[in-house]
Swiss-Prot record:
Keywords: ATP synthesis, ATP-binding, Cell inner membrane, Cell membrane, CF(1), Hydrogen ion transport, Ion transport, Membrane, Nucleotide-binding, Translocase, Transport. Coiled coil: none annotated. The gene is atpD. Signal peptide: none annotated. PROSITE patterns: ATPASE_ALPHA_BETA. Its EC number is 7.1.2.2. Pfam families: ATP-synt_ab (PF00006), ATP-synt_ab_N (PF02874), ATP-synt_VA_C (PF22919). This is ATP synthase subunit beta. It comes from Aliivibrio fischeri (strain ATCC 700601 / ES114) (Vibrio fischeri). ATP binds at G150, G151, A152, G153, V154, G155, K156, T157. The keyword Lipoprotein does not apply. NCBIfam families: atpD (TIGR01039).
Amino acid sequence: MTTGKIVQIIGAVVDVEFPQGEVPRVYDALNVVDAQERLVLEVQQQIGGGVVRCIVMGSSDGLRRGLTVENTGAPISVPVGTKTLGRIMNVLGDAIDECGDIDAEEHYAIHREAPSYEEQSNSTELLETGVKVIDLVCPFAKGGKIGLFGGAGVGKTVNMMELINNIALQHSGLSVFAGVGERTREGNDFYFEMQEAGVVNIEKPEESKVAMVYGQMNEPPGNRLRVALTGLTMAERFRDEGRDVLLFVDNIYRYTLAGTEVSALLGRMPSAVGYQPTLAEEMGVLQERITSTKQGSITSVQAVYVPADDLTDPSPATTFAHLDATVVLNRNIAAMGLYPAIDPLDSTSRQLDPLVVGQEHYDIARGVQSTLQRYKELKDIIAILGMDELSEEDKQVVSRARKIEKFLTQPYHVAEVFTGDPGIYVPLKDTLAGFKGLLAGDYDDVPEQAFMYCGKIEDALEKAKKL
């Protein structure tokens, strides 16, 4: 095992000098020998003269020039397999839940090749979420990649938690949750919610269904940049065992941002809007590995923060290309008090195809979108001239569109503590029946308030009797 000496420290970036001919490879993990606690460096560049530039997987406080560093000769390796279930780990795979060490039989390197084209499989099997607007206009595929796009405070994390509640609890498979640069409070809440739901069992960890990997907001950029790969490596292991895995990543934008911080510290010239020049490649390295093979599937749900609500920002724009379904959250819908604030006109899915979902589902979804689009076009006329100037046909469109907008809302299980309304899981067949009736005009005489925050159409009709 070769050793070197620290020669320069710039924040989260450290230069280490090794003897000529024994220089570590890019992505090798180095251990700082004299550090108070375990500190790992990851090689990013070989800059000549036996010197390598590394990022620190932890705080660089207390580091000084001249400290001895050992080369492990391999990339960072993390525990994989069933021993990780029910546990909270950091970027290095160390347990941070005070429940003892993880004695996994196997460790995988976090840097791995994506599966080849021959190994990959594509599926058109639908994954029901129980959320009306998602199941109707942007249905998810089992083994697909789903992105939740939204600005600050429009409900990405709440929607993510509801999907975990509806899919992970209904789906008997295993899940991996990667918290990338998000709030520690949210990670804490998630852990306790999973315990209450029985998905995490502290007494009998082998009965748990979820592994959690956290690299939170307060951690150095190296941790936030690599924690998504740590979570993905654990999910890949379950997939290769022939299981169907759910991978939840909150938040992909923080992964990009950590890359930007590291890129600046490494001295690279920034590109558009100050992002790293390797943005597309870094995103591709992560996203290409999130895929289903002939052995098993990885279905991933990724929250993507949209800076200043600008979907053309390079970070969300780069993410779009990799996804099968995009769920776009809209601040204007949230401002009207309609939750979930998912925009049915902006949200898309490759699965919304008559060959996949069937002709009836496709026609209902497109009918809902065309009604809402027509209402959007008429809003300017209504604002200037009022409703009276519209033709009878347009008045009918507006009336139905307003009911559809209200019927797209529903109470969430995870928001029960705030709203006091019990959450509702709506099966797809009930969603389709409700919207089909609304488009056909079966409920033209029902007041629109009755459609707010209800599940099936029968619930709205019951509500109407009390109005």
